[in-house]
Curated annotation (Swiss-Prot):
GO terms for biological process: L-leucine biosynthetic process. This is Putative 2-isopropylmalate synthase. Catalyzes the condensation of the acetyl group of acetyl-CoA with 3-methyl-2-oxobutanoate (2-ketoisovalerate) to form 3-carboxy-3-hydroxy-4-methylpentanoate (2-isopropylmalate). Keywords: Amino-acid biosynthesis, Branched-chain amino acid biosynthesis, Cytoplasm, Leucine biosynthesis, Manganese, Metal-binding, Transferase. It catalyses: 3-methyl-2-oxobutanoate + acetyl-CoA + H2O = (2S)-2-isopropylmalate + CoA + H(+). Its EC number is 2.3.3.13. Homodimer. Mn(2+) binds at residues 14, 202, 204, 238. It comes from Buchnera aphidicola subsp. Baizongia pistaciae (strain Bp). The keyword Manganese applies.
Length: 390
């Protein structure tokens, strides 16, 4: 049976942490509307205690968004939880997301606590959050470097308290896929009440493993993925949701999952967020880069002209991307030149392909990319020479 993966977007919270300046309420609302249109299940709208501006943004988003659950982050501090609930009180549906460091490094060096004290803080904060909603998510910060015994202990207690979602973050992007999937598998084996909660994952990209780690986690039981559009996020960024979503869609033979995502909105959503956040999309970015569906090799262009599936595993239009003409460069073959000539209105009898292609290569070597206008001029020049000879 195909199982659903919950898509939890944290572009407005974790993603914004990568920006040099805070986004205005108006810009955050625009992003939230784009995410709602995309079809994400949960929008983590912000961290309300962090600033009056963030509180106002979460409040406005909670009032306006109707088709996605709104979530706010809070530390295991009563004041944080109270403010998070206050910001979301007009939401159709909301979740309070509390987090606490669980690795020895975080417990001892950052929090200056014992693990028993961490347990007590979690218990108190879960109960506090449950005064406002029965939808509470608990994150074991730095789970990737937390001992398995400690991790399973705190997870079991949180689920006993009624926590519905347990998030396993690879906070500093430390793990590799085999290791991260083993953590998730071990949680399922060692936590007796695990069937009463959803396991979520939240991966960072410090070693370039965020997407791979997220995919490896759902293969062994995780049912919520947290990430950001374009992978924007603190340091090296978060798991890029568009990459995860397309992996699920394209590799259904291995990843037998479904989501609520409207795939045709992926490209426009990414471009909207890139523009608002003023973060350019690299040309070779998977799924949404300007080169993602371009082909310059003559062999590849010939294959594409015969059957696009030879070199494209994604139909560009399926994500809302309008296919671009083949780029004609010195690497292009005769087939690509003939195809382009036909597209701009020429018949094979209008020109000699051998002569045209020879001149095309010389021009391409000089200027790089050859345009439709260039091709027309080459034909015109060739015809003039022919007339002179005649």
């Amino acid at each position: 049976m195909t199982q659903k993966i919950i898509i939890f977007d944290t572009t407005l919270r974790d993603g914004e942490q990568s920006l040099k300046m805070s986004l205005s309420v108006k810009k955050k609302l625009k992003i939230a509307f784009a995410l709602e249109k995309l079809g994400v299940d949960v929008i983590e709208a912000g961290f309300p205690i962090s600033s009056p501006g963030d509180f106002e943004s979460v409040k406005k988003i909670s009032e306006r968004i109707k088709d996605a659950k709104i979530c706010s982050l809070a530390r295991c501090i009563d004041g944080d939880i109270d403010i998070a609930a206050k910001a979301m009180k007009k939401a159709n549906s909301f979740r309070i997301h509390i987090f606490l460091g669980t690795s020895a490094l975080h417990v001892q060096s950052k929090l200056k606590k014992t693990f028993d004290q961490i347990i007590d803080m979690m218990v108190s904060s879960v109960k506090r959050a449950q005064k406002y909603t029965d939808d509470v998510e608990f994150s074991c910060e730095d789970a990737g470097r937390t001992s398995l015994d400690d991790l399973c202990r705190i997870i079991e207690l949180a689920i006993d308290l009624g926590v519905k979602t347990i998030n396993i973050p690879d906070t500093v992007g430390y793990t590799i896929p085999y290791e991260f999937s083993n953590i998730i598998s071990s949680i399922y084996k060692k936590v007796p009440n695990i069937d009463k909660a959803i396991i979520s994952v939240h991966c960072h990209d410090d070693l370039g493993m965020a997407v791979a780690n997220s995919i490896s986690a759902i293969q062994v039981g995780a049912r919520q993925i947290e990430g950001t559009i374009t992978g924007v996020g603190e340091r090296a960024g978060n798991a890029a949701l568009e990459e995860i979503l397309m992996a699920i869609k394209i590799r259904k033979d291995i990843l037998n999952f479904k989501t609520n995502i409207k795939y045709q909105e992926i490209y426009s959503t990414c471009r909207v967020i890139s523009s608002i956040c003023n973060i350019p999309v690299p040309v070779n970015k998977a799924i949404i880069g300007s080169n993602a569906f371009s082909h310059s090799s003559g062999i590849h262009q010939d294959g594409i002209l015969k059957d696009k599936k030879t070199y494209e595993i994604i139909v560009p239009e399926s994500i809302g991307f309008v296919s671009q003409p083949l780029n004609l460069t010195s690497r292009s073959g005769r087939a690509a030149v003939k195809y382009r000539m036909k597209k701009i209105g020429y018949k094979d009898s209008d020109y000699n392909i051998d002569i045209l292609y020879s001149r095309f290569l010389k021009l391409a070597d000089k200027k790089g990319r050859v345009s439709d206008s260039d091709l027309k001029q080459l034909v015109c020049f060739n015809n003039k020479l022919k007339n002179l000879k005649d």
